[in-house]
Amino acid sequence: MAKEYSTISRIYGPLMIVEGVKGVAYGEVVEIETEWGEKRKGQVLDARENLAIVQVFEGTRDLDIKTTRVRFTGETLKVPVSMDMLGRIFNGIGKPIDGGPEIIPEDRRDVHGAPLNPVARAYPRDFIQTGISAIDGMNTLVRGQKLPIFSGSGLPHNKLAAQIARQAKVLGEEESFAVVFAAMGITYEEANFFKKSFEETGAIERAVLFLNLADDPAIERIITPRMALTVAEYLAFDYDMHVLVILTDMTNYCEALREISAAREEVPGRRGYPGYMYTDLATIYERAGRVRGKKGSITQMPILTMPDDDITHPIPDLTGYITEGQIVLSRDLHRRGIYPPIDVLPSLSRLMKDGIGKGRTREDHPQLAQQLYAAYAEGRSLRDLVAVVGEEALSETDKKYLEFADRFEREFVAQGYDEDRSIEETLDLGWELLAILPETELKRVKKEMIMKYHPKYRGRSS
């Protein structure tokens, strides 16, 4: 039952303290009305004996302690869901901003989702093609996985996110694939880039966009990824769709978490972030996966910018504990004009082995990826040696490794923003590059694979 109070004792930042309340619960939705009739929404952050701390989504600017009324609805925050959300753009709290009509909901779902019994989870399997060789070939994305992208300020992670959202597909099941894209704390320029990218390429038809701008209240950023994941769960488990959820930028999310924690005067943890940030991030990342008996799946690609390119910073550090690998963008590759600047050596997809190989991508994929990785690592190591002793000191084989490393970056890692490579094109390109090396150096690939896929022998009858 709804209860109304006008006993606000304090307003600071996005928070207000309401005293003399009874029967108020954590997470309860609050309706706030000013003396001139303006209505805002909020949520209970903390409920104690006779007071409640409320976070106001639209901010507390111009709210008067004496005349503002607060109504506790007794309900949790819910998002209206419908298949009509595909092709639409919303703000951070689910209101349409594309000029289209309001969504007529088929249902209303709690933004925090329902706890998923670990026993009910199915193991992530099957390949998702992003059309980007450095990911598909070397750090494969698997259906149901959570694979973050670790970027840095000024690197083209937004461009990469838009390309993945446009190109990603489940092979043979394109009609059941959708993208839910949530951007947090982005500028108007970035928001316009995403809108334009989705609309001009037609990717908007199979996508749902949530855009939280930098000048929107910080508290809204806490809700945005949960809104997106609630819609993703609806599409995946009610309509058996394979949903890719892209969240950018999780660093902005964590900054909002720190800002609200400071406003609540909580004891800070590492670098001022709240001590519960690991648990909070887990409530987002752990909503990826597959459920036994359900055809649909949720795959997550959170994107975060590492402050000062520091991979040990609390945000990437804690993210790495929860997720299943990472795609690392390199400032050095970016400076040399290579897009996407994915550094395959520190990058890792822990579930890659379960989504590739015969019947999923191609039988040679696991061995080819290992050989490419080993050869590129050797080439990178020799680059450092050349800087000390010069190229004249290298053997002919060493020079081949140097050539391989250079061409691997220019031809395999680098590709156009509009270039969508199939997995077959990616793997064949890998073999073309391995042909630079003597066959005796291909120690991680079985002889029968060399005879079948190496350019020297390809096309010959067995």
From Swiss-Prot:
Q: Name one Pfam family in it.
A: ATP-synt_ab
PROSITE patterns the record matches: ATPASE_ALPHA_BETA (PS00152)
What GO biological process term is on the record, naming one?
proton motive force-driven plasma membrane ATP synthesis
Q: What is its main location?
A: membrane
TM helices/strands, residue ranges: none
Q: Which InterPro entries match?
A: ATP-synt_VA_C (IPR055190), ATPase_a/bsu_AS (IPR020003), ATPase_A1-cplx_bsu (IPR005724), ATPase_F1/V1/A1_a/bsu_N (IPR004100), ATPase_F1/V1/A1_a/bsu_nucl-bd (IPR000194), P-loop_NTPase (IPR027417), V-ATPase_su_B/beta (IPR022879)
Q: How does it assemble?
A: Has multiple subunits with at least A(3), B(3), C, D, E, F, H, I and proteolipid K(x).
Protein name, entry field: A-type ATP synthase subunit B
Q: What gene is it encoded by? A: atpB
